């Protein structure tokens, strides 16, 4: 079974090219593949397939709203094997892989996901690196009735803004938090939040106030733990940073441990632009894969 390994600002993925959606992906198999000691190691798995094939194979019960049968489909799994709706860094790496492998020749095309269609623009790409923008759709804030959202990260309590970017986020901006304090925070430790507010779990971002157009952010992803970057999380972070400044739209650079991305929020949608790197291509032992599925 062939694979590729790639990352977007060090949020890393194993890509499995499976256009007919014939590959059996179990939670146990995905978790083993993502394990950094007994597998290849990754924050998640991206199955590269077509939307119609995914629906015909039962990967999807139906095509997500707005996704056409002839669109590409990103079947994304978290490192714990759970199915995820969306991954902004993953979409960029997915689009890069399509171009680098010759499966796609256009600069602009649509990548389908459980969260719906995600139009992408490949500004530049070669076999190793790419610069990709993704139309992430409109990011919606939750709790308009004045509901308070809080989380504990690294033993510290933060208030946050709940944001839906196709998946749930709690973006916690602390105006008193310095860049050095953020760097020292134990984001990898178990987090806590109100499970009644987020029954399916939540991705939690901790961020500084913007300075010179830059927000510093770290993230604890549901089903994974701390990652070096989270694309949808950077969108949520910019929504929160703009809201704290009394704005609904704008552009900010988000600096995560894995690098920089640029997020633009408009009245109608949001855009995520950043790098993708394809690191390796190889083949997974069929015997190992069959054992890992159990």
Curated annotation (Swiss-Prot):
Keywords: Amino-acid biosynthesis, Cytoplasm, Isomerase, Lysine biosynthesis. It is found in: Cytoplasm. Substrate binds at residues 11, 78, 88-89, 167, 203, 221-222, 231-232. Pathway: Amino-acid biosynthesis; L-lysine biosynthesis via DAP pathway; DL-2,6-diaminopimelate from LL-2,6-diaminopimelate: step 1/1. GO terms for cellular component: cytosol. Homodimer. This is Diaminopimelate epimerase.
């Amino acid at each position: 079974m062939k694979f590729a390994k790639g990352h977007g600002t060090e949020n890393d993925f194993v890509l499995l090219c499976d256009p007919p959606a014939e590959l059996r992906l179990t939670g146990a198999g995905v978790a083993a593949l993502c394990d950094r000691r007994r597998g290849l190691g990754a924050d998640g798995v991206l199955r590269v397939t077509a939307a119609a094939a995914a629906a015909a194979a039962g990967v999807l019960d139906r095509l997500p709203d707005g996704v056409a049968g002839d669109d590409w489909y990103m079947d994304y799994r978290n490192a714990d094997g759970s199915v995820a709706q969306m991954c902004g860094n993953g979409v960029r790496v997915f689009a890069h892989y399509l171009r680098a492998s010759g499966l796609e020749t256009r600069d602009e095309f649509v990548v389908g996901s459980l969260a719906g269609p995600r139009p992408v623009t490949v500004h530049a790409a070669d076999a190793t690196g790419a610069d990709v923008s993704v139309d992430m759709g409109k990011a919606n804030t939750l709790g308009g009735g004045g509901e308070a959202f809080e989380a504990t990260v690294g033993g510290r309590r933060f208030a946050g803004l709940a944001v839906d970017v196709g998946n749930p986020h709690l973006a916690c901006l602390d105006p008193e938090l310095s860049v050095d304090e953020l760097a020292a925070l134990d984001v990898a430790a178990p987090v806590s939040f109100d499970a009644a507010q987020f029954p399916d779990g939540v991705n939690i971002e901790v961020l500084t106030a913007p300075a010179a157009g830059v927000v510093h952010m770290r993230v604890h992803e549901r089903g994974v733990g701390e990652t070096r970057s989270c694309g949808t999380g950077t969108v949520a972070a910019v929504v929160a940073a703009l809201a704290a400044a009394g704005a609904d739209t704008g552009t900010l650079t988000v600096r995560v441990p894995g690098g920089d991305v640029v997020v633009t929020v408009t009245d109608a949608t949001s855009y995520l632009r950043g790098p993708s790197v394809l690191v390796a291509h190889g083949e997974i032992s069929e015997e190992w894969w069959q054992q890992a599925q159990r």
